[in-house]
Every structure is written in C-alpha cells, then in structure tokens.
Curated annotation (Swiss-Prot):
This is Non-specific ribonucleoside hydrolase RihC. GO terms for cellular component: cytosol. Belongs to the IUNH family. RihC subfamily. Pfam families: IU_nuc_hydro. GO terms for biological process: purine nucleobase metabolic process; purine nucleoside catabolic process; pyrimidine nucleobase metabolic process. It is an enzyme of class 3 (hydrolase). PANTHER family: INOSINE-URIDINE PREFERRING NUCLEOSIDE HYDROLASE, NON-SPECIFIC RIBONUCLEOSIDE HYDROLASE RIHC. Hydrolyzes both purine and pyrimidine ribonucleosides with a broad-substrate specificity. Keywords: Glycosidase, Hydrolase. GO terms for molecular function: purine nucleosidase activity. The active site is at H235. It comes from the Bacteria. Its EC number is 3.2.-.-.
C-alpha cells in the first residue's frame, strides 16, 4: 500500500513515544515528513537525543528539529521519575553522528507546511508548546494544517494532577492557545488511552518479533515493569492509531477549554460533553475505543517494523 497521509510528529520521547514513533514510521498508510521534539517527559536536550537515537536505530531518513526547552510561562515539570533520567532507560542504543536541523521546531514545521502541496496533518504526543509557538509566530499557518491530532487531555480524571493529564498540565497556556486557534483538533485523551492496554501475553512475544520488538520490550520492562504482568497502557500510540484506523474510536464534537488559573485545576481540559456552556465545538474528543481492534492493529504495525 502506498503511503497516503503525510504527517509531522511533535513528540517528547519518552518510552511510550518510542512505540508511537515506530508506528508513524512503519504504518504503511503514513509518510512521516518531519519529527520535532519538545520538553516534556524529560528535558528537550534529552528528548532530542532520544529522537535521534530512535531514527538512527531504524535508519530512518526523517529530519528532526529541536523545539521548546520550557513551557510558555511556567518552569518545566518533567516525568523523569517514570521514564528514567535519560527518558529511555532500559536499552543500550549505539552511538551515531546524527544532528538536529539548525532551526527551531516551530520554524521547521512552518517550512514543511508552507512547502507542502496541500494542508498536512500534525500529530502532537507531548506538551503543545511547539504547536502554540507556531500559531503565535505564524498564525497564517493554520490554513496549511488539515488537522491536529493530539494525545492529551481528559474528560474526567487526570494522571498528573487529580484532574489534569500530563501533556496538557505541563504547558496549560500553550494548550489553551491551541484549542482557541480554530484548527480542526482530534483529542485522544485518557478516556481512550487508559483503555489502550496491551496484554502480558502479547508483550511477551515482542522480543522474538523483530529488533523493534526487542527494543520496545526492553524499554517497556524498565518503564512499567509491573504492567508487563498486568497489561501496559499505550497512551501515545492512540494518536497514531486514530490516523490509520479511525473506526476504532468513538468521537464526540465538544467545546474544550483549558484551565490555566486554578490553584488545583490548572491544566484541566474542561470537556463540555453535554453542551452546558453553550459554546461551539472546537474539538472531536475520543471517548471510547475498540480495544480488540486496537490490539490487532498494534500487532500488525509492529510486525511491519524491522
């Protein structure tokens, strides 16, 4: 099958990001044109190093641009306590000479968008700082964005604070700007990503699958060793899965606002499922997932990798 959907991936690798990057590279329906990094799971220097390591591991001819080192207005709160000090503990990647592009991520994204023959799809699986910077500096670029698919947010409980999901909570101001931008947004938040669980039985097959499976198994074992026995949530993979298999997801058009001021609620995505606020919808929010179909797709795409 010829690749039909050209995408830009903004990411903060991060162990679960590695699985999403694999899918973006090897799902036959996708053509990854640019990868950009942002501070999130760990510092941007580390997410950039990790992204370059992954591209070298797969010998992927994809340019990478380093992005924002800090949120727009706040100090960075990372997740090194989950992903390890380097962000991808658990696998020994070989040395390489790859370097990022000599321009920041938001400019690299602008350049790819403006040179594309038609509007492109952006996929953001980390904090939305780079996307906000793009829209703030080059608001005209929104007409060159077909759609933004994000892993972030929640219509219910959070995973970083009681109400806020990590990617949004790291940079609420950036997320608020993006949701107000008028671009088409598909939000794959915790409502579906908490359902996207790979079984211990499947995880145990990864080392024998291919070199990608071996690498991911090593990362996953370090990332969530207990989950290797109970099942592992694949948060970031959901954004890639929606691009390829949207029929697996149940979406609802909603107005989504991002809280930036609350002492206890900053970073919360207020998802107006019942339309109580009387505001026009600004996002398609994924609320349910065909879990068996998702697992089948993951197995298929990982088997396509080297």
């Amino acid at each position: 099958m010829a690749a039909s959907l050209h995408i830009i991936l903004d990411t903060d690798p991060g162990i679960d990001d590695a699985a999403a990057i694999a899918a973006a590279l090897f799902a036959p329906e996708l053509d990854l044109q640019l990868m950009t990094t942002v501070a999130g799971n760990v510092s941007v220097e580390k997410t950039t190093r990790n992204g370059l390591q992954l591209l070298h591991f797969w010998d992927a001819d994809v340019p990478l641009a380093q992005g924002a080192a800090t949120p727009l207005l706040r100090p960075l709160r990372d997740a090194a306590y989950v992903h390890g000090e380097s962000g991808m503990e658990g696998y020994d990647f070989v040395d390489h000479q790859r370097q990022p592009l000599a321009k920041p991520a938001f400019i690299a994204i602008r350049d790819v968008l403006m040179n594309a023959p038609e509007p492109m799809t952006l996929v953001a699986i980390g904090p939305l700082t780079n996307i906000a910077l793009l829209l703030m500096h080059y608001p005209e670029c929104r007409f060159n964005i077909h759609r933004l698919v994000i892993m972030g947010g929640s219509a219910g409980r959070g995973n970083f604070t009681p109400n806020a999901e990590f990617n949004i909570a790291v940079d609420p101001e950036a997320a608020a700007h993006v949701f107000r931008s008028g671009i088409e947004i598909v939000m794959c938040g915790l409502d579906v990503t908490n359902q996207a669980v790979l079984t211990p039985e499947y995880l145990a097959t990864l080392p024998a699958l291919n070199k990608t499976g071996g690498m991911l198994h090593a990362l996953f074992s370090h990332y969530r060793s207990g989950s290797m026995q109970s099942g592992l949530r694949m948060h970031d993979l959901c954004a890639i899965a929606w691009l390829v298999r949207p029929e697996l997801f149940t979406l609802q058009s909603c107005f989504v606002a991002v809280e930036t001021q609350g002492q206890y609620t900053a970073g919360t995505t207020v998802v107006d499922i019942e339309g109580r606020l009387g505001q026009p919808a600004n996002a398609q929010v994924a609320l349910a997932l065909d879990v068996d179909g998702f697992r089948q797709w993951v197995a298929e795409v990982f088997a396509c990798a080297p």
